[in-house]
């Protein structure tokens, strides 16, 4: 879902969202909330409303915020039970400065890479682990190349349901009964 003409309606995952407005990262701050109820309160509350406003300023009309889960850890080296366990492990993290800095502060070797390269990189030992919501871990079969899963709910992964603002305005004019 972009402000341009290529995409009209869709879901905007949290990682590209800050490309449109860096303030959107605020919804994914590490350990902001540790439960799904808390994540829903953040998405449905003032922070979610602000994120939608910021995207609107960039030509993206938000229709709602879905919940993609929490970002969890997998790795092939050892169980992670404390920050010390992360030392020396090379993790692929989502490409935002916030995630890179978080992992570095925890002592991990944090790198970014295209998600399409992750499975092969894990197989070949280029990286030792990564972080994603469990739905992505499962659907991408990453559990086939990772021995350890750490459920630490460190970052809420919202899914912005959105539409190009120009298209939405046109549809509202065409169908005046539409409302959000």
Predicted features by range, described:
Residues 1-38, 46-180:
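N-terminal secretory/targeting leader peptides
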